[in-house]
A protein has these predicted regions:
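Bacterial N-terminal signal peptides that target proteins for export
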Residues: 4-19
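Bacterial N-terminal signal peptides
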Residues: 18-28
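Sec/Tat signal peptide C-region and signal peptidase I cleavage site
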Residues: 28-34
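A contiguous strand-loop segment
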Residues: 35-133, 153-308
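Short, well-ordered beta-strand elements within core beta-sheets of diverse protein domains
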Residues: 137-144
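Glycine-rich, aromatic-lined ligand/substrate-binding cores of catalytic
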Residues: 235-389
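Substrate-recognition/cap regions that form aromatic- and gly/pro-loop-enriched pockets
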Residues: 334-472
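Histidine-centered catalytic/metal-binding microenvironments
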Residues: 453-565
Length: 565
């Protein structure tokens, strides 16, 4: 009996270690490759544009706007490929004779490609391939005009050069169509298997680091494309044994565990909850988002309650599960200023039980983010716009940048600073400084920042109409060069205005909220003085934290703090 008890205790310890290792691995995956995309078809948008959002979330990614002008190349040229995440040299591929201009994740033909990483089965990663997921995006943008062309080119890259990344979900949109393409490697075999589904017009979709394509039509090439061996390969690996029509890409290649639901699908749930109130029953899928009921799967796409605009879409990217059961502004970890952030690592253990913090759409480690717009009713020089921002989406604004520009605004230029090199003219470093101050007194500072964000973005929506009209007249008069110069100037000027406003905010916030106080202001925005006329401020305001926070302090340290008689 003693031997049996000893064995059982050993088994219990081993099981706990395994669970902790699994949790640690999942948390590492979420932290390393945690991004969010929302996709809006033209029939679901206010102005008839196709839109894609992307938050590139990484603790090692610098926020800058990539730019590659159109170019011609000698026949037989090669292109060096470097892994986007690490900078590691992966090899060479054949270059084409002409490449298109790219600005961020868009090109001159208004094609958009964004991604989120889901990993999938570990044994399917091919470490010897050349085309990592970042290279697939940016090289494909240089070669494709439409979403369908992009899918075909990505497939050619995968089968020819191999795929050294984990499972990926790509958002691919052009002037007319929006697609989700999901890819996994084939282990030591060259190539990859994938499936791509077109989002029906009038609908929206989203993905956030978990495969979302389950069953798909096998004979509908207008709406669904896939590799010929997507099912047979799963059979050969023992991932699937049923009928072809019952095949689920996600279940075969990236089966969702608790972490995938709680840390990833919950973000999709949040986006659907915001944009689909009245058409999407969020309560119905709450147990799925919490990770309790993996069989209660959410749909791949939904119809939004109302048509979606750039501003509404940008605001989705600022979500922290506010006013939902996942809202984490009011537990003790939020502090007295109700900060909806938890510093890494995401998971911890207490008394042998594992816990994890929330992972919302908005997060502190965003390098850059955007709302990309493909406006097919306008010429390509004007129609492609990437509303670009850096750092945490909840405390930063996006500014419109046309994809026909001839140079990137200085504050977003590649080489203007880096993750280990500070630059005073870099938007990434400026926004990080302001945001880090906001993290100190979040529920005081965030409303101020949000008002500034709203004013800037709403103002940009008005100004871009004027910029569109001005450039269109030039194009219609045959003055393409003038039109492009005008759009380049507008993009640079608006970016500079954003940068300068945040410089002012940095100073203002420090003066107003220094040392945990709130300085009083006059109606004209100036700070009140005490009446002496000597620059001494009026008595500052000190707000009192919620009773829940005070009770937590008393529970933790009350005896030492109790006021005596």
């Amino acid at each position: 009996v003693k031997i049996l008890i000893k064995k059982l205790k050993t088994m219990k310890r081993t099981f706990q270690i395994v669970i902790c290792l699994m949790l640690a691995f999942w948390l590492g995956q979420v932290e390393a490759n945690a991004c969010t995309n929302v996709i809006v078809t033209k029939g679901a948008s206010k102005d008839g544009s196709c839109m894609v959002t992307y938050s590139a979330d990484s603790h090692q990614l610098y926020g800058e706007l990539y730019y590659a002008p159109a170019a011609t190349w000698p026949k037989g040229s090669k292109m060096e490929i470097y892994e986007w995440d690490s900078g590691r040299h992966l090899g060479q591929i054949n270059q084409v004779e002409r490449t298109y201009q790219t600005v961020g994740n868009m090109n001159e033909h208004q094609l958009i490609i964004a991604e989120t990483t889901f990993g999938g089965r570990h044994e399917l990663a091919n470490r010897h391939g050349i085309m990592d997921y970042g290279s697939l995006i940016y090289v494909t943008l240089q070669r494709a005009r439409t979403a369908r062309e992009a899918i075909a080119i990505i497939d050619e890259f995968l089968q020819t050069y191999g795929f050294p990344s984990g499972g990926e979900s790509f958002s691919i949109a052009d002037k007319d169509e929006c697609w989700i393409m999901e890819i996994v490697g084939k282990g030591e075999e060259l190539g990859a298997v994938w499936v791509a589904i077109r989002i029906p017009d009038g609908y929206i979709s989203a993905h956030a680091n978990q495969s979302r394509i389950h069953k798909f039509p096998l004979n509908d090439p207008e709406n669904c494309l896939y590799t010929p061996d997507v099912i047979s390969f799963a059979r050969s690996k023992g991932y699937f044994t049923g009928k072809d029509e019952d095949f689920s890409f996600c279940d075969a290649y990236a089966p969702a565990d608790w972490g995938a639901l709680r840390g990833c699908e919950a973000r999709v749930w949040a986006a659907f909850n915001i944009l689909g109130k009245g058409t999407f029953d969020a309560d119905k899928y709450l147990d799925f988002a919490f990770g309790h009921n993996p069989d209660n799967k959410m749909p791949l796409y939904i119809k939004p309650t109302e048509k979606v605009g750039v501003k509404e879409l940008a605001d989705v990217m600022r979500d922290h599960f506010e006013d939902t059961p996942m809202d984490f502004r009011y537990d003790v970890g939020a502090g007295p200023h109700e900060i909806p952030y938890r510093w890494r690592p995401m998971g911890f253990e207490v008394d042998g039980k594992a816990y994890r913090y929330e992972r919302s759409i908005a997060t502190q480690q965003t390098g850059f983010w955007f709302v990309a717009q493909s406006r097919g009713w306008l010429p390509d020089e004007i129609g492609g716009v990437i509303w670009f921002g850096v750092d945490d989406a909840a405390t930063s604004a996006v500014t419109p940048i046309y994809t026909s520009i001839t140079e990137v605004p200085e504050c977003f230029r590649v080489g203007n600073g880096g993750m280990t090199t500070y630059s005073p003219t870099s938007a990434f470093w400026l926004f990080n400084k302001v945001t880090h101050f906001a993290y100190l007194f979040y529920n005081r500072v965030e409303p101020v920042l949000r008002a500034e964000i709203d004013a800037f973005e709403l103002g940009s929506l008005k100004l871009i109409k004027e910029a569109d009209a001005k450039a269109l007249k030039m194009l219609q008069a045959g003055n393409r060069g003038q039109a492009v110069a005008s759009l380049t100037e507008f993009s640079a000027k608006r970016s500079e205005q954003l940068f300068n406003r945040w410089l002012e905010l940095e100073e203002f916030l420090l003066v107003k909220f220094i040392d945990g106080n709130i300085k009083q202001q006059n109606e004209d925005g100036t700070f009140k003085d005490n009446g002496s006329g000597k620059g001494i401020p009026a008595r500052p305001i000190n707000d009192i934290p919620r009773e829940r926070w005070l009770r937590a302090i008393v529970k933790d340290h009350g005896e030492a703090m109790k006021v005596g008689k």
